[in-house]
């Protein structure tokens, strides 16, 4: 997540328009799809440790390379590698979380996602601060090396608790089996893509929107992103306190509507106010992104938990298969959002799309009924 506050610089280095940058960025989903088709089976066959180490190395190297690029075609290739690495790492980590959740006998995935979001916010704050003082190449290179070493240390500490390689003889499992064993849970997949697009759109566009539309300087442009993910931390870490009083189904049904309406309303208001009061426009920007983040916070971990419960396959495989569908749909939706911003000349108009998708989750809330 360290490169998110640097998106305006990466976009400038590559000399791309909003539509081009958004499209090329979303092509990382192609690499993600390839990784998701196979990573779940690799975790099941080889264990979580090996997958995490290889994915972490590839992820850190690809981000470090991106910081130096000025060629759009090379960026596309490296971004696909980055997408594949992140997906493989994510699948192994979520499978490990399901393993711990099954042993604990309670829903802990939301809290794990909350801790992940804490890391994302800390990284964004640090990176936003570094924007003013350090060049992108030095910043990302040093951070990538440090992060990889930290990940290795954590993996070493967690090794006794990690998912071990399967003892079953699955040597006959071939390339064709990746597709024949594929299962789609249409309702959960639809709910997931609609529920996470506010989060993804915030990561992709909030910094660019604050800088180019609202007109705030570098470090202030990262604040909408930071506040959004701070709100998500509160939502994810606090979910277990609310659930005894309000069912997950009701949380999703009402929260998605409030979040979607608030997200669209305040972002559009900020766009209308920018010519009259930059301060008021900036405040509306902060509120809009934060509302969207808070009320969409529990959706991703909840829907992954629902998918795992509704499937008889190993958790790593379920996460991978869900991820494939999600990555394909994400690529399509991100591309639509990017070119809506390009052709309309307004990122605020483009943000209506993820806002409406969040509202639509209310009609799919029954997937959480039995959790």
Positions of the model-derived regions?
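Short amphipathic helix-loop junctions that connect adjacent transmembrane helices
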Residues: 4-19, 204-220, 342
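Helix-breaking motifs and short loop linkers at transmembrane-helix boundaries and internal kinks
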Residues: 15, 47, 68-73, 215, ...
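Conserved MFS/SLC helix-loop-helix module at the cytosolic interface between two early adjacent transmembrane helices
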Residues: 34-73
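Helix-to-loop junctions at the C-terminal end of transmembrane segments
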Residues: 35-48, 131, 235-248, 274, ...
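Intracellular juxtamembrane helix-capping segments at the cytosolic ends
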Residues: 87-103, 297-311
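Symmetry-related core transmembrane helices of the 12-TM Major Facilitator Superfamily/SLC fold
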Residues: 138-156, 349-366
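C-terminal transmembrane helical hairpin of 12-TM major facilitator-type secondary transporters
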Residues: 249-303
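A late C-terminal transmembrane helix in Major Facilitator Superfamily
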Residues: 310-345, 349, 354
